[in-house]
Regions:
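Helix-rich interaction surfaces within compact, conserved domain-sized segments
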Residues: 278-279, 283-298, 302-304, 310-312
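Long, intrinsically disordered, charge-dense linkers/tails
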Residues: 221-226, 230-231
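Short amphipathic alpha-helix segments
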Residues: 229-242
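N-terminal alpha-helical "arm" segments
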Residues: 1-36, 41
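A short linear hydrophobic-aromatic micro-motif
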Residues: 247-251
Length: 333
């Protein structure tokens, strides 16, 4: 069985033979694409009369090849993906004027150390061990939210500075993806109701039994449940929760989509950080991990900062150099 590097070369050299005749003169390339927490390798097949082509990520196709060990079958799957993605791309014609973009830019948080390569190519600013990046929301429908990461080139070509993106995104995120703080009880009850569980059964299970606020877990996300960890940047929500609980908070980054807030009386931050690390490594996919650290919110100072400092391992478990600065910085570019 060929390794992944050889697989990429074989696909690149042979894919045109598996595509329809109109692709005969297409140009083929394979290139690395920095994504959140990882780098993927994409195949592009550019038709002669087009100025863009979809990325077909080869990691997934390589998994298919490992399962069937038949390169011809896999090439046929890749070809089908190319044709389908090219058709879909032709249907999408987003308006790229500056007004449309500035009204639909939202905040997203990623881990700084794990995303060094990605951060070279995108406008960003540091926040503790994380970085704020920006996504342009192209469409929202019943299937979810379609968005793209804004790159340096994209921003420069449309006249946006990082500061302008930040200011637009702070306001837009509250409108497009309103922050939401709910107790874990409420979240579990909502999920159970969505699954059709009767109210009476939920009550008999004690789902609605009152738990003191300082003993509860609180989920900080947004109404979409997508990239909701950025909601921790809205300090007024943290302050309101801390006042309700009556103590400072520890924030546990469960994924890029949400964080869990608890009273500081719930345990030592080092213990909580170990729990976050263990969950990250066993239950959260690499592309959705945010941090192995825990954050402390001081309700009197109204300040959010790191409670722990465990940068010795990246989110993929690889030993990493410790970042030198954890304080919030100004625009990175």
């Amino acid at each position: 069985m060929m390794d992944f590097n050889m697989f990429q070369e074989v696909v690149k050299d042979n894919i045109l033979n598996s595509l329809p005749a109109e692709y005969k003169e297409a140009s083929v390339s394979v290139h690395a694409v920095p994504k959140v927490n990882r780098t993927l390798h994409a195949l592009t097949v550019m038709l002669p009369d087009r100025n863009k082509a979809p990325n077909i990520y080869l990691e997934e196709m390589y998994e298919h090849y490992q399962q069937n060990e038949d390169i011809q079958t896999t090439l046929a799957e890749v070809a089908d993906a190319v044709v389908e993605a090219t058709k879909e791309m032709s249907k999408v014609n987003p308006v790229l004027d500056a007004d449309k973009i500035q009204d639909n830019v939202v905040l997203c948080l990623v881990n700084s150390t794990q995303n060094e390569e990605l951060l070279k190519d995108v406008p960003n600013r540091r926040f503790q061990d994380l970085s704020v990046i920006y996504r342009w929301v192209v469409n929202i429908d019943r299937n979810g939210m379609q968005s793209m990461i804004i790159t340096n080139d994209f921003a420069a070509n449309r006249g946006f500075t990082e500061e302008e993106l930040f200011q637009h995104a702070v306001e837009n995120t509250k409108r497009i993806c309103p922050p939401r703080v709910k107790s874990m009880q409420e979240v579990m009850a909502d999920l159970a109701v969505e699954d059709g569980m009767p109210q009476e059964l939920l009550e008999s299970m004690g789902v609605f039994d009152e738990i003191p606020p300082e003993k509860n877990l609180w989920v900080i996300t947004n109404e979409m449940g997508i990239n909701g960890a950025a909601s921790m940047l809205y300090e007024e929500n943290l302050h309101k929760l801390a006042e309700q609980i009556g103590t400072d908070l520890y924030l546990l980054p469960s994924s890029i989509h949400e964080t869990i807030a608890v009273s500081v009386e719930m345990g030592a931050p080092e213990y909580l950080a170990q729990m976050v690390h263990d969950v990250n490594m066993t239950a959260v996919t690499l592309d959705e991990r945010l941090s192995n650290n825990v954050y402390h919110y001081d309700k009197d100072l109204r300040k959010l900062e790191l409670a722990t400092d465990v940068p010795e391992k990246g989110l993929d478990g690889v030993i990493a150099e410790p970042p030198m600065i954890y304080e919030k910085e100004g625009p990175a570019r």
